[in-house]
Structures are given as structure tokens and as C-alpha cells.
């Protein structure tokens, strides 16, 4: 049997631990026997990121901008224990965070619904899609530990040298400080992606922050969403028979648990990170969740929504049997292939008939 041909290489980002093992198995057993696979390969394993001072992550994002479509394996975001385990030069930032910052756009995560696996929340009869803002907040934060008494200030220096200062806290002892930021342009792109995706999929869109507490930071998100919706999408939503709904994040959680599903839940970066894991677990498993980063510039990056499955990897190293669920990683490859079908021969379109575009 002749292999399906590819006309343009696509970006492949390898990863860590057990998912790295699965990654190679999927290629060897499901892809390479049938496709003349052409990828521009980047090893985002923690050892290679450490060797290159994380430059390999930056280069993989640039390649995605060049070729338009990428598929990514799960990767380790190091903590103190990983620093010791891998003898790292420094505690490298999340590769996902770096890639998201460079590509912008929105991460859409949805459960893989199959017969025989019922949601733990009995009212849920339809999938719930999490739209996670892909830039800023805690993932691009700067942090500092303070050893003793002192004054912490938030300082903005304008181009003309003018300074604006806000007191953060008068420390009486040791503590920690964190500075976060976001960009109006990125929030606007997030809003457009969410509204367009809702129209494409004919689903209601929910958005939630904590603007009653964060009266400038979170309120900016709320205001930008509402302004864009009123000016550009309100009529289209009415014609499509769908709605845009804003509420506080705690109220949204309560409503979600009582809903039947079938909507898109737009969240800020951290909220989306947490809630997507909750949604996936309640629908069955973290290994049954798709994830795609959609950039307003036309870039797509597909991956599984779960991590590297560390415990299984340690068992694998000992020669013990594991039963790691590979479904979400397989779906990342199928969605990647489906999206890139124009770069392949026509036969590849039929190879993954169940794969769905974002």
C-alpha cells in the first residue's frame, strides 16, 4: 500500500515522560505506516529546553507562525523538585505559556464524549467547551520574595518619564509579591475568537471574571467583551438564536454545575486552566479532553489537555506495566491532520474521518 503524501512539513513539538513514550508509539503504529510524515521537529523535552536555555521553545513557536499548524506533546513545567531531578540551570517557564504568548489567540478545550462514559454531573448531557485566554496573568507574572519589613509599590513609567505609583503593601515581615499584566489587544483577540467560535458552533457563550473585586484588571476584560459584542456580534447572535452571557466567576461555577451543558465557557488564563481540568474529569478523564490554541492570525496548535503522566513514567522506567490513556494525544494528531488537510494529498482527508475542526 502506498503511503499518503504530504506537500508541506508541519510543526511537531515533542515532550516529556510517559506522553513522550506514547507520542512515539502513535507515530510508529498509527501514522508512519500510512503517511509519508513530514514534520519540522522540535524537542521540547525538559533536558533539551535546559540545554538550549529554552530557546528551542521560542523556535518552535516561530516555526508554527511559518507553517500555520503545529501538534504538541505534553511537557514538564518545572518546580523546585524538578530543578533538582533534572539539574536545571533555572526554573524554566511553562513552554505552553511561552508559545501562547507568542501566538496569542484562545485555547479551546472540550471533552471527548463517547458512549458508555457518563458524566459525573448527571445534569450534563452535552459537552462544555472551555475557552481559555492564552496570554498573560499569572503565566507571565513577575514574582519576588521579600525577607523583611519594607514598602512594595506598583510603578508605571510612561514614555515621557512620568511615573504613576500605587502602594501594594507595607510589609512588617517576610512575604511575597507578584505582578501581573495583560494587553487590551490580546483581550480583544480573545473576545473575537470566542464570539466567532460561538457563531461557528451555534453555541451560547458565557464569560466570567471577578470584576466586583478586581475593579480595574478584571473589569477591563468585562468591558472589552461587552463593547465588542454590542458593536460587532449582537445582531449575528440574535440571528443565530444564541446568547452571550456575563456573570461573576463564582456564580458561573454554580450555574455550570446545574446546567445541561452545550455552551462555551470563556475564562481568563488561570480560571480556564483550572476549570478545563474540572470539566474533563467530570466528563470522564483528563485523557479525554482535546485542546487547540487558535490564533487570530490563523495559527493552530493542537495538543492533549493533560500532563506528562509522571507516575506512569516512573513505573515504565522500572519495567512495570502501565495502562496510560492515549486517546487525547491521538486526537491531537487527528485534529492536526484534519486541519492540515490542504497541505496533504486528498487521501489524508479520509484517514481521520472523525476528526473535527475547531
Annotate each predicted stretch with a short phrase.
Residues 2-4, 11, 62-65, 119-124, ...:
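Solvent-exposed alpha-helices and their adjacent loops that cap or buttress functional pockets
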Residues 2-8, 18-23, 28-53, 61-64:
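N-terminal alpha-helical transmembrane segments of multi-pass membrane transport
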Residues 5-8, 37, 65-69, 123-127, ...:
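Short coil/turn connectors at secondary-structure junctions
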Residues 6-25, 29, 154-247:
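Glycine-rich phosphate/diphosphate-binding loop of Rossmann-like nucleotide-binding domains
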Residues 43-46, 217-265, 269, 274, ...:
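Active-site rim loops that border cofactor/substrate pockets in soluble metabolic enzymes
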Residues 47-163, 270-274:
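N-terminal glycine-rich phosphate/adenylate-binding segment common to multiple enzyme folds
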Residues 256-353:
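Glycine-rich phosphate/nucleotide-binding loop
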Amino acid at each position: 500500500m502506498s503511503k499518503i503524501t504530504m506537500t508541506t512539513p508541519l510543526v511537531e513539538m515533542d515532550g516529556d515522560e510517559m506522553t513522550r513514550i506514547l507520542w512515539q508509539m502513535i507515530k510508529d503504529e498509527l501514522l508512519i505506516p500510512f503517511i509519508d510524515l513530514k514534520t519540522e521537529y522540535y524537542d521540547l523535552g525538559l533536558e533539551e529546553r535546559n540545554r538550549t536555555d529554552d530557546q528551542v521553545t521560542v523556535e518552535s513557536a516561530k516555526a508554527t507562525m511559518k507553517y500555520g499548524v503545529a501538534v504538541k506533546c505534553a511537557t514538564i513545567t518545572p518546580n523546585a523538585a524538578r530543578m533538582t531531578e533534572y539539574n536545571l540551570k533555572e526554573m524554566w517557564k511553562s513552554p505552553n505559556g511561552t508559545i501562547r504568548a507568542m501566538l496569542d489567540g484562545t485555547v479551546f478545550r472540550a471533552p471527548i464524549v463517547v458512549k458508555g462514559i457518563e458524566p459525573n454531573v448527571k445534569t450534563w448531557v452535552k459537552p462544555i467547551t472551555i475557552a481559555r485566554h492564552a496570554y498573560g496573568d499569572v503565566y507571565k507574572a513577575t514574582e519576588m520574595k521579600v525577607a523583611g519589613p519594607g514598602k512594595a509599590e506598583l510603578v508605571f513609567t510612561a514614555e515621557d518619564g512620568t511615573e504613576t505609583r500605587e502602594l501594594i503593601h507595607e510589609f512588617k515581615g517576610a512575604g511575597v509579591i507578584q505582578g501581573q499584566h495583560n494587553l487590551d489587544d490580546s483581550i480583544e483577540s480573545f473576545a473575537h475568537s470566542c464570539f466567532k467560535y460561538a457563531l461557528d458552533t451555534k453555541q451560547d457563550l458565557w464569560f466570567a471574571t471577578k470584576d466586583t473585586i478586581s475593579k480595574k484588571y478584571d473589569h477591563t476584560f468585562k468591558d472589552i467583551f461587552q463593547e465588542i459584542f454590542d458593536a460587532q456580534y449582537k445582531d449575528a447572535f440574535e440571528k443565530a438564536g444564541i446568547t452571550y452571557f456575563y456573570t461573576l466567576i463564582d456564580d458561573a461555577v454554580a450555574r455550570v454545575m446545574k446546567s445541561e451543558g452545550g455552551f462555551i465557557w470563556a475564562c481568563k488564563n488561570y480560571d480556564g486552566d483550572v476549570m478545563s481540568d474540572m470539566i474533563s474529569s467530570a466528563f470522564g478523564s483528563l485523557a479525554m479532553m482535546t485542546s487547540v490554541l487558535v490564533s487570530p492570525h490563523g495559527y493552530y496548535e493542537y495538543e492533549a489537555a493533560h500532563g506528562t503522566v509522571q507516575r506512569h513514567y516512573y513505573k515504565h522506567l522500572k519495567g512495570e506495566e502501565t495502562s496510560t490513556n492515549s486517546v487525547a494525544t491521538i486526537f491531537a494528531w487527528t485534529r492536526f491532520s484534519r486541519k492540515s488537510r490542504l497541505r496533504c494529498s486528498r487521501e489524508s482527508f479520509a484517514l481521520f474521518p472523525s476528526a473535527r475542526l475547531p
